[in-house]
Design a protein with these regions (language model features):
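A structural signal for short hydrophobic beta-strand segments in well-ordered beta-sheet cores
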Residues: 1, 48-49, 151
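Beta-hairpin "wing" of winged helix-turn-helix
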Residues: 1-5, 9
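A generic beta-sheet turn/junction motif
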Residues: 5, 52-54, 155
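Amphipathic alpha-helical effector-binding/dimerization core
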Residues: 9-104
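A short, flexible beta-alpha/helix-coil linker loop
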Residues: 15-17, 107-108, 168-171
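Cysteine/selenocysteine-centered motifs that mediate thiol-based redox chemistry or coordinate metal-sulfur cofactors
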Residues: 105-106, 187-193
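Intrinsically disordered, low-complexity polar/acidic regions
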Residues: 110-111, 142
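Extended hydrophobic
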Residues: 117-189
Length: 193
């Protein structure tokens, strides 16, 4: 509500959610079965998150049995500099788009482990591209880790979403490579559907 004239208007948050709903139409339906299979195999919570401008919107999750205190849930928005889902999307942005995003640094921190500087994020982009996945090591929630892989549009070659899985940080760190391989297999299955 605009208090000066008494009129109501929608905030930008509503527009972002509308955009996220639009991008999460039926083309993401094959991801649901993939996510449930990943969760059944790992016990971790898996997430499908869609890029919306300079943010990431979680559109689906398959709840694991280990942790129920994760920040990322359907409808929630996270920045691209925090968490495996956001940072993998940032890493696979075109260079010019990534640089535009990085111009907003330093970014707000969730805790002392959040990557907030241009230097930290550029190094993370390099590492993420090198290994093919982003690793969240308690950078959003203490005690929680995650691995995220990109989902790239087959036609444009641009990153449009990410598939990630999270759980207790020790388990994530110990299984990060096999978890990343499982997530990449999931992305291939989603894209083939």
């Amino acid at each position: 509500m605009d208090w000066s004239d008494g009129n109501y208007s929608l905030s930008l948050d509503w527009l972002r959610l509308a955009d996220a709903a639009r991008t999460s139409r039926t083309e993401w339906q094959p991801a649901i079965a993939v996510m449930h299979a990943i969760t059944a195999q790992t016990g971790m919570t898996s997430f499908l998150s869609v890029v919306s401008g300079t943010e990431l919107v979680c559109v689906e999750c398959a709840q694991g049995h280990a942790i129920d205190s994760l920040i990322l849930r359907p409808g929630r928005v996270l920045p691209l500099h925090a968490g495996a889902a956001g940072r993998v999307a940032l890493a696979y942005f075109e260079d010019a788009d990534a640089e535009r995003y990085l111009a907003g640094a330093p970014f707000p921190a969730y805790n002392e482990n959040t990557l907030v500087s241009v230097e930290q994020l550029r190094e993370d982009i390099r590492l993420t591209r090198e290994r093919g996945y982003a690793l969240s090591d308690e950078d959003v929630t203490l005690g929680v880790g995650a691995v995220g892989v990109p989902i790239v549009d087959n036609e444009s070659g641009r990153v449009i979403a990410s598939l990630s899985a999270g759980g207790f940080v020790d388990e994530v760190l110990a299984t990060q490579e096999s978890l990343a391989a499982l997530l990449h297999d999931g992305v291939h299955e989603i894209q083939a559907a």
